[in-house]
């Protein structure tokens, strides 16, 4: 473990930032400063047009503003952040903030500003001589020129809750059907590596679909633009069950992450004879919220606010829940999916995740003799770990596995690491 935050580390990080392409792209046009405080000491890194200038010691902290970002933490928290192998939540400035161990102020309203601050934190580690947490980008062998992927995409028309949906899905492989669900505000591209993994497709017919309003599944309805998008439990379950029936899937295995992980448990509760097993990645009986008027009002406020900010912000804010050891290309691709979401979609998905999904008190009604339940949760999604553990304890016959080196988006942030955990589970079904 290295020492705590010091002036020489900040000066070193500023020099690295001045030559860092990622930091420069994210700070273009930023006239202001990044201020760092450790206990009673504080320093200012001036930025002119996004380029760092000489570090200045401070005698008092300035008021936080969008152009003056202030990062404060106790010496012990900085020591954890600057350790060789930081444990959750200290692998990321914003992860530590979510856990109440650091403070980054003000609340940042654009993804580039958020990512620039995150990047400066990682450059502090490099200035301390620590090995980068993220492995260097290595070229993928990929496909030969002119060669197609295995996955093939199609559109299918489905009637769900009295509405005709034109739903997009991709599939590859043959065998036991494996139905894959994406996270909030993303789409089936998150599963692209699984669709090409012949360790899986040699035994499973892998199908990944886009929810309406996501990816290539357009909104349904005659005047959808005049309607509030809200993902309810009934609609989410209806789409999965109706798609399985339309494709004539014989008791598929369902796997989903985040909202898909929550949906997995709803399907195990209400559709036990449709699915032979569900694999809940980052799933639980409930999120941190419950079904309440206050919760619904919070979702509506967030939806309105989201229209005023960078649509990439939700993904940037969740970067701290990804594994710091995941390939940088996977982390960046995960955030790209979010950046391409329409305003209001993330908030509409959160309604299901944080409000409408609620199975507390119903775990005993899930019959794992009819539909097996497997919970797998990444260690860097630290808030979900105890929630997933509780679900496994309360659902008779369910199992829980903590996935080391993974976060909230296992299938897109680090497919190979996910396979270390998913392949043994899938082996039970094919």
Language model region names:
Residues 369, 375-377:
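Short beta-strand/loop motif that positions the catalytic acidic residue
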Residues 162, 208-255, 420:
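Active-site loop/oxyanion-hole signature of alpha/beta-hydrolase fold enzymes
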Residues 289-294, 308-367:
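Conserved alpha/beta-hydrolase catalytic His-Asp/Glu region
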Residues 265, 269-270, 274-308:
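Flexible "cap/lid" loop of the alpha/beta hydrolase fold
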Residues 382-387:
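Conserved alpha/beta-hydrolase "acid-adjacent" motif
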Residues 398-430:
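Catalytic active-site module of serine/aspartate enzymes centered on a nucleophile-bearing elbow/loop
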Residues 161-223:
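Conserved HGGG/HGGXW glycine-rich cap/lid loop of the alpha/beta-hydrolase fold
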Residues 1-146:
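Feature captures hydrophobic
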């Amino acid at each position: 473990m290295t020492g705590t935050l010091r002036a020489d580390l900040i000066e070193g990080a500023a020099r690295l930032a001045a030559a860092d392409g990622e930091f420069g792209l994210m700070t273009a046009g930023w006239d202001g400063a990044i201020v760092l405080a450790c206990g009673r000491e504080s320093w200012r890194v001036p930025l002119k047009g996004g380029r760092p200038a000489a570090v200045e010691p401070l005698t008092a902290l300035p008021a936080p503003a969008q152009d003056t970002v202030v990062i404060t933490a106790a010496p012990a928290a900085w020591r954890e952040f600057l350790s060789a192998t930081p444990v959750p939540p200290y692998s990321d400035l914003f992860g530590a903030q979510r856990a109440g161990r650091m403070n980054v102020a003000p609340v940042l309203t654009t993804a580039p500003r958020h990512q620039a601050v995150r990047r400066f934190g990682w450059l502090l580690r490099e200035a301390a001589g620590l090995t980068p947490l993220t492995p260097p980008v290595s070229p993928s062998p990929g496909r030969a020129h002119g060669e197609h992927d295995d996955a093939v995409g199609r559109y299918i028309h489905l009637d769900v809750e009295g509405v005709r949906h034109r739903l997009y899905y991709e599939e590859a492989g043959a065998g036991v059907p494996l139905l894959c669900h994406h996270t909030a505000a993303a789409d089936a591209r998150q599963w692209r590596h699984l669709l090409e993994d012949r360790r899986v497709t040699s035994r499973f017919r892998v199908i990944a679909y886009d929810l309406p309003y996501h990816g290539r599944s357009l909104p349904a309805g005659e005047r959808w633009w005049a309607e509030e998008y809200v993902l309810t439990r009934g609609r989410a379950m209806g789409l999965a069950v109706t798609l399985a029936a339309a494709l004539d899937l014989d008791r598929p295995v369902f796997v989903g992450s985040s909202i898909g992980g929550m949906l997995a448990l709803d399907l195990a509760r209400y559709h036990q004879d449709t699915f032979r097993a569900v694999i809940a990645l980052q799933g639980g009986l409930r999120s941190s919220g419950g079904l309440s008027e206050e919760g619904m009002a919070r979702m509506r406020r967030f939806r309105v606010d989201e229209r005023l900010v960078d649509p990439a912000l939700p993904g940037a804010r969740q970067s701290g829940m990804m594994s710091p050891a995941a390939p940088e290309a996977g982390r960046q691709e995960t955030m790209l999916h979010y950046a391409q979401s329409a305003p209001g979609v993330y908030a509409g998905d959160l309604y299901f995740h944080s409000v409408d999904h609620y199975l507390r008190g119903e775990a005993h009604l899930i019959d794992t003799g009819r539909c097996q339940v497997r919970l797998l949760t990444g260690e860097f999604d630290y808030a979900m770990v105890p929630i997933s553990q509780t679900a496994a304890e309360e659902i008779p016959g369910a199992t829980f596995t903590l996935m080391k080196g993974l976060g909230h988006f296992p299938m897109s942030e680090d497919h190979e690491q996910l396979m270390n955990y998913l392949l043994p589970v899938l082996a039970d079904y094919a």
